């Protein structure tokens, strides 16, 4: 059972990611997201040749248009507020500072909440996407927790005493850009740097690593469960096949994955040692596709690194997976909107 707060009014909720834009509704007095529409984001992934500012304009036009279409649906009451989760660092007052997966390089700071309010004529709540995802679990987690998304990149947020632990200017919760490999030829990060945690322990980074391992050790690769689906071609290995092989116990796949997860274990150990958070929830397509295998291998590495003062049982017990769906940001931004707009009570719903 997951405790969720019902919406105080009819809401349109949106999750703007680098790959997909999701827009849905939450009916007043409920917490369930329905009528979800998913469309490819009109950003860097589709129009990479365009300049960053042009991409930002294109993304905002699409976001505004799709939200407007959800405000008044046949047979439904008009929505009275909007809540948006956004893939990029954001200030406390809703200004997006960057959009690496949306428009790439530098563009003008984007006051997304103000822009949407002006365009739509409704109150707008906006937050970073990982902040939104963390709010999904806020009512269900009585102790401070760190939510980390492991998908094409890595991001995190710490939720403590009813609030996300970030600076007013949006700094914090970006462990994906923590430098863990100082080599000049370290894996490239989408931000333009190299050797960042998100370039190594993410789904994209782990795939890069297993392909490199396959190319470097042809005989071990040939004996692996990955050889068949890829036709023996390292560059043809997919994340889906990699996750399936690791779950099935394939030694080659699991050892490559273990190496990729080592710096993530170091990040968890550092967070625990620095601020004492003892609950770590993991979401994101790559982590959830691996399931218990992700927790087992990450736990192995975390025990090896160590968490000062904790034994093996207590160390492994800190790690858990979030709900196995792609609605974390939609549900979470609805929860944040309920907290900010005001809601009288919490209800229990089946996860």
Curated annotation (Swiss-Prot):
Signal peptide: none annotated. GO terms for biological process: antibiotic biosynthetic process. The keyword Flavoprotein does not apply. Pfam families: ROK. GO terms for molecular function: kinase activity. Keywords: Antibiotic biosynthesis, Kinase, Transferase. Its EC number is 2.7.1.214. The keyword Ion transport does not apply. It catalyses: valienone + ATP = valienone 7-phosphate + ADP + H(+); validone + ATP = validone 7-phosphate + ADP + H(+). Involved in the biosynthesis of the antifungal agent validamycin A. Catalyzes the phosphorylation of valienone and validone to their 7-phosphate derivatives. Belongs to the ROK (NagC/XylR) family. This is C(7)-cyclitol 7-kinase. The lineage of its organism: Bacteria, Bacillati, Actinomycetota, Actinomycetes, Kitasatosporales.
């Amino acid at each position: 059972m997951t405790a969720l707060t019902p919406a105080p009014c009819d809401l349109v909720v949106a999750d703007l990611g680098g790959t997909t834009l999701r827009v849905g509704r939450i009916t007043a007095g409920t917490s369930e997201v329905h009528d979800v529409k998913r469309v490819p984001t009109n950003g860097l992934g589709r129009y990479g040749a365009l300049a960053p500012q042009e991409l930002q304009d294109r993304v905002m036009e699409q976001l505004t248009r799709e939200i407007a279409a959800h405000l008044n649906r046949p047979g439904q009451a008009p929505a009275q507020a909007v809540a948006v989760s956004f893939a990029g660092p954001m200030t406390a007052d809703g200004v997006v500072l960057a959009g690496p997966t949306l428009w790439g390089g530098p563009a003008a700071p984007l006051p997304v909440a103000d822009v949407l309010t002006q365009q739509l004529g409704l109150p707008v709540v906006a937050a970073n996407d990982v902040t939104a995802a963390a709010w999904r679990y806020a009512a269900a987690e009585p102790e401070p927790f760190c939510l980390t998304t492991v998908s094409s990149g890595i991001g995190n947020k710490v939720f403590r005493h009813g609030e996300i632990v970030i600076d007013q200017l949006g700094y914090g919760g970006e462990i994906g850009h923590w430098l863990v490999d100082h080599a000049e030829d370290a894996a490239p990060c989408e931000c333009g740097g190299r050797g960042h945690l998100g370039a190594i322990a993410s789904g994209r980074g782990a795939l890069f690593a297993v392909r490199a391992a396959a190319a470097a050790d042809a005989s071990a690769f040939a004996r692996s469960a990955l050889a068949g689906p890829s036709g023996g071609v390292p560059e043809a290995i997919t994340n889906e096949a990699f996750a399936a092989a690791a779950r099935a116990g394939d030694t080659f796949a699991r050892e490559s994955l273990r190496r990729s997860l080592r710096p993530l274990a170091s990040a968890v150990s550092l967070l625990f040692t620095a601020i004492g958070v003892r609950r770590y929830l993991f979401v994101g397509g790559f982590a959830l596709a691996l399931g218990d295998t992700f927790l087992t291998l990450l736990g192995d590495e975390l025990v090896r690194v160590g968490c000062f003062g904790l034994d093996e049982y207590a160390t492994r017990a800190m790690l858990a997976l979030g709900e196995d769906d792609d609605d974390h940001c939609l549900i979470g931004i609805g929860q944040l909107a309920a907290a900010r707009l005001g809601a009288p009570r919490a209800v229990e719903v089946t996860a």
